[in-house]
A protein has these predicted regions:
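Short, glycine/charged-rich "phosphate-handling" switch motifs in NTP-dependent
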Residues: 114
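Acidic, metal-coordinating helix/loop segments flanking the phosphotransfer/catalytic sites
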Residues: 40-62
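Conserved sequence signature across two-component system core domains
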Residues: 15-16, 25, 41, 63
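Non-catalytic signal-transmission and effector/linker regions of two-component phosphorelay proteins
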Residues: 1-13, 19-34, 122-151
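Receiver (REC) domain active-site loop signature in two-component systems and cognate sites
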Residues: 69-70
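A Lys-centered signature of the CheY-like receiver
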Residues: 119
């Protein structure tokens, strides 16, 4: 773990309808940064209801969204987040999905996702992916569209 990370309290939100995937993510995040505050949503509607109640100072640094969720998909959440009038639209939104369908990737990019990653198949790969995301300069990565997809 980086020394700098110990002094930074990170707040992250994960929306995924699969409880096993949420647990997998939480365990990986805990190993990467035991000080992270991770909030979880079981679907997009629950996520948006909670995000819209937060003050600007309570907004997460990152929102990780699964694409295929009941009631409101990750892409619908992304669109709502980016169309929000407040600072919510400035939050880093990472699409984390099993889908590597070019149409989903293109749609996420068009809607303003900060990054798109295909869910890794192993715990170690997930830890590596999350560590990379937490440490990268997302503004410059987003500006360089060729780095948009991380598989």
């Amino acid at each position: 773990m980086d020394v700098d990370r110990q002094s930074i309290q990170r707040y992250i939100y994960l929306a995924d309808d699969d409880s096993d995937d949420r647990d997998f993510f939480a365990d990986a995040m805990l190993e990467i940064d035991p000080h992270v505050i991770l909030k979880q949503a079981h679907d997009g509607m629950y996520l948006m209801d909670n995000l819209l109640r937060l003050s600007n100072s309570e907004l997460p640094e990152f929102i990780f969204l699964d694409i295929n969720m009941p009631r409101k998909s990750g892409l619908e959440c992304l669109e709502e987040i980016r169309n929000h009038n407040g600072t919510l639209k400035e939050v880093n939104v990472i699409m984390l999905s099993t889908s590597s369908d070019p149409e989903n990737i293109q749609k996420a990019m068009e809607l303003g996702a900060t990054f798109y990653a295909v869910k890794p198949s192993s715990f170690e790969k997930l830890k590596s992916l999350l560590d990379d995301i937490l440490n990268m300069n997302l503004v410059s990565t987003f500006q360089e569209k060729r780095k948009f997809l991380f598989v």
